[in-house]
Amino acid sequence: MKSRVRMIVVLVCVFVVLPVVGGLVYLSRISAEAAARYYAEAIAQGRFEDAIAVEGTDADADSGVGRGGAVDLRRGRVSEPSSVVSVRVYDARDVRGRQGASIDLSVNGRTITREIYLERVGVPRPHVGMWRVVSGAAQVEMVRAYGYASDVSVGGVSLGALGASGDGGATFPVAASTDGLWHAGSGGAVVYAYPGIYDVSVAKVSEHTQVAVDSVSGASTLSVLSGSREHQIDVTQDESTRAWHEEQLGSVASSCVLGDVPEGAVCSNMSVAGAERVDVEAPTRDSGDLLEVLVAAYRNDEGIDAFTAHSRVCFDEEGEAHIVVIRP
């Protein structure tokens, strides 16, 4: 009986204890360079959950990153994988005893360098052993957006809508009702992201709009690289709608002044009592989608009302364009 018990104990040691101990010994011997390389490979391949698992819960708390209320794109996905060019571990620890390393990633043909810091932990973990990343490769980026969209997402993570429907969404003072019309508006967010190329997805409110990312018309990706940390996503009227707006604004403004609102248009504070004739100069455009026109209304008492009218395009629920013109 004793021999059987002894044999069971031996078997347990051979098949259970020794592999566990051996595994712990192996993990404890993983170098900082190997841990940093695993972390870099996880980011390059878009395995962000694996990269996050290597980071401490307080990662970057002391590095000045200050994520705050930033949208966490580390929970998103890249449109295409990158590759690790090199991993270099510094010879000396910093004053806090942390091990520094520099990782180079090849992203869309460009080499991106990130400096990370690791520190030893008490319990070994898979792939990285006794190391964890306390200052990671993600950084804060500003993504600004403007236009017409019910949702804009980057890397599968929503940044919210651009504009809104109805009078509450108007970006200039409209006294008349715009119920059911979608106004352009601003949006975007501060994001916290690893280096990579991220898909930009836009839920358009109209097919008469076009998308530009970082001033590239028709682009559908956003690059988090080493350069500018500011990005711009625009969902604006397409060229044919812009041209239509400019061509039609003169006649729409004239009709509004005379009190004869064209079908589909919205006139706000435009009517001039006693107006018999209206002159409207060619419109001028600001840097965005706002058109301005100089209007002169000749009244039947020989008086003249001269003012500048403002106009924007809104879209209805079917995505059709409507001209909104106001007298501020």
List the model feature ranges, each with a label:
Residues 11, 113, 237-241:
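Intrinsically disordered, low-complexity segments enriched in small/polar residues
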Residues 104-188, 193-199, 203, 209, ...:
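Short beta-strand edge/turn micro-motifs at domain boundaries
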